[in-house]
């Protein structure tokens, strides 16, 4: 074992035996690891093992088995996310997506920073729908999916309006629409925004303004990309899909 200090974000925890927990933490320095916490009911670690908790951890890393949390400081509990059912649901999906995207025990400080910044912006109140879309698009390469939404797959023209071709796994300009009669028939603004999402530096993102109709179109297209190219269906994603069916009722009850 080795002692290592690292920032970390708790992905989830689960009960283990009578009063112990297994806690999965995405650490900046050591990747995603499973940590064993004994006697959680009496442990000083109880405040930092809940999902969506970030902290500076002192860790005992075991490369062949469970690791251990020695100490922590600088806890960030994402209070606004945890107080808002909708923000919490989307943030939980982002956590699950990060967990699914890379192997355990392999450091990925770039993805860690991207996840942390995404959660920070959701906490600050930026549009969680669009932040989730940006995260989904930029994390595609971690699943081995690399797409160019910037120029036509045939002539590399950057002239809009583009449409997406599943046949060619890329966009077509109007001069090459005929190459795929089964192309999506997308609103060109969807491709424009997806291209922006793919290249935007989230650290520079200050405001988001996308109307509800465009959000629905983006959601449908990104869902199709994940179904066709990634092939995962996370429980947290199923849950936020269900939110769309009855979310308006809850928002009305909450006075939103």
Swiss-Prot record:
The keyword Cell wall biogenesis/degradation does not apply. One of its GO terms (biological process) is double-strand break repair. It comes from the Bacteria. One of its GO terms (cellular component) is bacterial nucleoid. Coiled coil: none annotated. Keywords: DNA damage, DNA recombination, DNA repair. The keyword Amino-acid biosynthesis does not apply. Involved in DNA repair and RecF pathway recombination. Belongs to the RecO family. This is DNA repair protein RecO. It comes from Streptococcus equi subsp. zooepidemicus (strain MGCS10565). The gene is recO.
């Amino acid at each position: 074992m080795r002692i290592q200090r690292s920032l970390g974000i708790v992905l989830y925890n689960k009960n283990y035996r009578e009063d112990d927990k297994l806690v999965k933490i995405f650490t900046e320095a050591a990747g995603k690891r499973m940590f064993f916490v004994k006697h959680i009911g009496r442990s000083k670690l109880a405040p930092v093992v809940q999902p969506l908790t970030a902290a500076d951890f002192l860790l005992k890393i075991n490369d062949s088995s469970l690791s251990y949390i020695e100490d922590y400081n600088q806890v960030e509990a994402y209070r606004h996310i945890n107080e808002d059912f909708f923000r919490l649901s989307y943030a939980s999906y982002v956590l699950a997506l990060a967990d699914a995207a890379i192997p355990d025990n392999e450091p990925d400080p770039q993805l860690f920073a991207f996840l942390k910044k995404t959660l920070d912006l959701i906490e600050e109140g930026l549009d969680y729908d669009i932040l989730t879309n940006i995260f989904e698009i930029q994390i595609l390469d971690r699943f081995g999916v690399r797409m160019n939404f910037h120029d036509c797959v045939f002539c590399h023209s950057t002239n809009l309006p583009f449409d997406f071709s599943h046949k060619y796994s890329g966009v077509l300009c109007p001069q090459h629409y005929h190459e795929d009669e089964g192309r999506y028939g997308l609103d060109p603004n969807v491709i424009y925004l997806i291209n922006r999402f793919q290249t935007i530096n989230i650290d520079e993102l200050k405001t988001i303004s996308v109307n509800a109709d465009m959000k629905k179109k983006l959601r449908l297209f990104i869902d199709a990309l994940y179904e066709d190219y990634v092939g995962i269906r996370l429980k947290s994603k199923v849950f936020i899909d269900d939110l769309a069916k009855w979310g308006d009722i809850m928002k009305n009850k909450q006075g939103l």
